[in-house]
Regions:
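Terminal amphipathic alpha-helical/low-complexity segments used for targeting or macromolecular assembly
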Residues: 1-82, 193-225
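Intrinsically disordered, low-complexity regions enriched in small/polar residues
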Residues: 46, 58, 116, 121, ...
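C-terminal segments of enzyme domains that contribute to small-molecule binding surfaces
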Residues: 132-151, 155, 181-225
Length: 225
């Protein structure tokens, strides 16, 4: 009797779900530190941005483990419940903060670094329909304001800020502020150091983020090949 069970895939799924659980713990730590309205641990139960991020992490675990149907099912549930559209193939480092979440769109080849805050209505999308890398790479400790659109395979440097409703179609340097349509650099400070409160914790978040994100990127490359 032939058993249609791929134990290798199941083993990989278990490992990815464990990674997702670790990432969610780091997400909680960042949310507590970065959301000024956060008052008590019970808010995790009602914070739509955090809950949608948690669903993304689960869908991503299924996606990179080649359980595509279940990955897209969870992705669709996320869209219905929270109006958040994060493709399960996207790579979000542990420690991303989604504030409100409503209308957020993140494409399949996008990468987002830890400490980054994404407000409602943000789009990390493509400029053209093409194969390969076509969505933004957002560094660490970036703020992307409400309604901002970052389009194409552009790079947003660490500690950068994108103004609300801006449309970014070119790279933004580290520490810079970009506003407008199309976005222009209005402030540039490449020597700006990371915000210290993001890194002083009992959890070594960036090391954990590096390890998990490298694994996810390697898995994603295999899936997209």
């Amino acid at each position: 009797m032939h058993l249609l069970v791929d134990f290798g895939k199941i083993k990989k799924l278990i490992a990815e779900l464990i990674n997702a659980s670790k990432a969610i713990k780091i997400d909680k730590e960042y949310l507590r530190r970065l959301d000024s309205s956060f008052e008590s641990s019970y808010q995790y139960l009602f914070h739509a941005g955090f809950r949608s991020l948690r669903l993304y992490r689960i869908s991503h675990a299924f996606y990179v483990s080649d359980f595509k149907f279940l990955a897209y099912l969870i992705y669709h549930i996320n869209r219905i419940l929270y109006t958040v559209d994060i493709h399960p193939a996207a790579v979000l480092e542990p420690g991303v903060v989604i504030d409100h979440g409503t209308g957020l769109v993140i494409g399949s080849t996008a990468v987002v670094g830890s400490g980054t805050v994404l407000y409602h209505g943000v789009t990390l999308g493509a400029k053209y329909i093409t194969k390969g890398k076509r969505h933004p790479t957002v560094g660490r400790n970036v703020i992307v304001g409400a309604g901002a659109k970052v389009l194409g395979p552009v790079y947003i440097g660490d500690n950068a800020k994108i103004g609300a409703n801006s449309v970014v179609i070119s790279d933004v340097p580290k520490g810079a502020t970009a506003v407008g349509i199309p976005a222009r650099i209005v402030f540039k400070n490449s020597t700006e150091s990371p915000k210290p409160h993001l890194f002083h914790s009992t959890i070594d978040k960036n090391d954990a983020g590096d390890e998990l994100c490298h694994k996810k990127e390697n898995n994603l490359k295999k899936v997209l090949m």
